[in-house]
Amino acid sequence: MRRCTNIRPGETGMDVTSRCTLGDPNKLPEGVPQPARMPYISDKHPRQTLEVINLLRKHRELCDVVLVVGAKKIYAHRVILSACSPYFRAMFTGELAESRQTEVVIRDIDERAMELLIDFAYTSQITVEEGNVQTLLPAACLLQLAEIQEACCEFLKRQLDPSNCLGIRAFADTHSCRELLRIADKFTQHNFQEVMESEEFMLLPANQLIDIISSDELNVRSEEQVFNAVMAWVKYSIQERRPQLPQVLQHVRLPLLSPKFLVGTVGSDPLIKSDEECRDLVDEAKNYLLLPQERPLMQGPRTRPRKPIRCGEVLFAVGGWCSGDAISSVERYDPQTNEWRMVASMSKRRCGVGVSVLDDLLYAVGGHDGSSYLNSVERYDPKTNQWSSDVAPTSTCRTSVGVAVLGGFLYAVGGQDGVSCLNIVERYDPKENKWTRVASMSTRRLGVAVAVLGGFLYAVGGSDGTSPLNTVERYNPQENRWHTIAPMGTRRKHLGCAVYQDMIYAVGGRDDTTELSSAERYNPRTNQWSPVVAMTSRRSGVGLAVVNGQLMAVGGFDGTTYLKTIEVFDPDANTWRLYGGMNYRRLGGGVGVIKMTHCESHIW
């Protein structure tokens, strides 16, 4: 500020610039009390402002442009349209004639779609549905509303079905929606046996049919299905498509057919027999089958076996601590492709989260978001790649909580609530959307690991709030009681735990002084723990899971570095080996395994 000096009464109207000196604008002269300050930011202001502007629009007040769409006139404010749409911003701020017009004609756009998009600009709300998506997406593309384009594509992803996937694919291609196009392609390949029966398949142009049947990932039991699909397509409109048969048949892998089918069905088909190019393709396949010694010289696209992606188990890594903060990100590992890919994030950041799978849905329970302890629960559906927050919360906040499924219930075991270490146990009934307390453990446990084996729930290790524990308790749901069993050989908190080959494995964690790489396993038949070869890295806050018969240790903290590496245990060689890494480093993240019944993981 400028500090003014020697201003006498009566001089307040004169120019005093020359009598001011520059100083700290936030500092008053010495001896003057500093005023109290309270910065204020209104969360309501943006919403309330938009609501008022929208009312002005509805009453046609202060509107400075009228959009003419077909027979419809839509009153609006240029500044709002320009703020939301690059299309309108270019129109109104450039040298185009529309920048000077009060009425602007918009062509090639649906009236109702334009109304919905203008409403969105003023309200931030829109509903995408079957009745409007086919007009809404082209309109959003024209107006360059990327957010609405994404919403429309997300809606169409959820509608994918063998009866409509080809239509959605064509729609995505027309409007350059690359991700939707990729997903529709994958869906078509994985569900080809059903897709080939659809009306959409019969209406395909030849070039799109070739694109589909050329894929190595086409999911068919045998090449016979591909041949039958092609012939059904040709015969659907035989006069038009008969000349296209040789071109399409080149992409059927005839050398992979059985000799009986090749000779008895393909070679005897009148359409094949009457075309020279088709006969040549059949002869090529016969030579491949009859002359095995010549096969190395005959390799090509038609002799390459298809490699459809089969359904299997997929590992999910959820939340955790990374780069100094709790994270909400989630990624999944597919053993068949050996890839980690990001999926939808949770609505909240969660470190120390408990994760388990119930009815093919992934649950994330409690945790800490970096500032608060949580009692909220989220549920992930791999079919839609979406998290839902409509799950009832636990009765108390919990982080470093153990979560497992037993008898159709989701159990939350121990943890801490920010005040004390917990021995409280409760279970969730998905049918009632309700948590109910069951018997508490005999020991308070945070950083506890849990496992289910033989109809019992095991609580392994953890900390009582003072020291790491080696004690183990087992819950009998029939009795609603906990019983103490044999302790581990090592005290461990924040360990990983999983059932593998009918034994409970406990790995890593932290003892009184350091992070651990050691591992041990519990045999319920002998009630004994025995050591297992140590992992290659120390890992506290590690996740442990069994994926397609492999025991995998995921992430953690080695005392210096947050880890994204994975280790796999080889029971025959009694060794651990490194097995790639996640996209994110994760300490205290949860892991869960879902059996993908319809190859959803390969689509998202």
UniProtKB/Swiss-Prot annotation:
Positions of the BACK domain: 165-267
Cross-referenced Gene3D superfamilies: 1.25.40.420, Kelch-type beta propeller, Potassium Channel Kv1.1, Chain A
Pathway connected to this protein: Protein modification; protein ubiquitination
InterPro entries named in the record: BACK, BTB-kelch_protein, BTB/POZ_dom, Gal_Oxase/kelch_b-propeller, Kelch-typ_b-propeller, Kelch_1, SKP1/BTB/POZ_sf
GO cellular component, one term: trans-Golgi network
Location relative to the cell: Cytoplasm, Perinuclear region; Nucleus; Golgi apparatus, trans-Golgi network; Cell projection, Axon
Domain of life: Eukaryota
CDD domains referenced in this protein's UniProt entry, alphabetically: BACK_KLHL20 (cd18459), BTB_POZ_KLHL20_KLEIP (cd18249)
Keywords: Actin-binding, Cell projection, Cytoplasm, Golgi apparatus, Kelch repeat, Nucleus, Protein transport, Repeat, Transport, Ubl conjugation pathway
SUPFAM superfamilies in the cross-refs: Galactose oxidase, central domain, POZ domain
Phenotype of the disrupted gene, per the record: Approximately 50% of mice die until day 28 of postnatal development (P28). Mice that survive beyond P28 are indistinguishable at birth, but show a progressive corneal dystrophy, associated with an epithelial hyperplasia and an altered corneal epithelial cell differentiation.
Role of this protein: Substrate-specific adapter of a BCR (BTB-CUL3-RBX1) E3 ubiquitin-protein ligase complex involved in interferon response and anterograde Golgi to endosome transport. The BCR(KLHL20) E3 ubiquitin ligase complex mediates the ubiquitination of DAPK1, leading to its degradation by the proteasome, thereby acting as a negative regulator of apoptosis. The BCR(KLHL20) E3 ubiquitin ligase complex also specifically mediates 'Lys-33'-linked ubiquitination.
Oligomer and partners: Component of the BCR(KLHL20) E3 ubiquitin ligase complex, at least composed of CUL3, KLHL20 and RBX1. Interacts with PDZ-RhoGEF/ARHGEF11, DAPK1, PML and CORO7. Interacts with F-actin. Interacts with IFN-gamma (IFNG). Interacts (via kelch repeats) with IVNS1ABP (via kelch repeats); this interaction blocks the assembly of CUL3-KLHL20 complex.
Entry protein name: Kelch-like protein 20
Source organism of this protein record: Mus musculus (Mouse)
Lineage: Eukaryota, Metazoa, Chordata, Craniata, Vertebrata
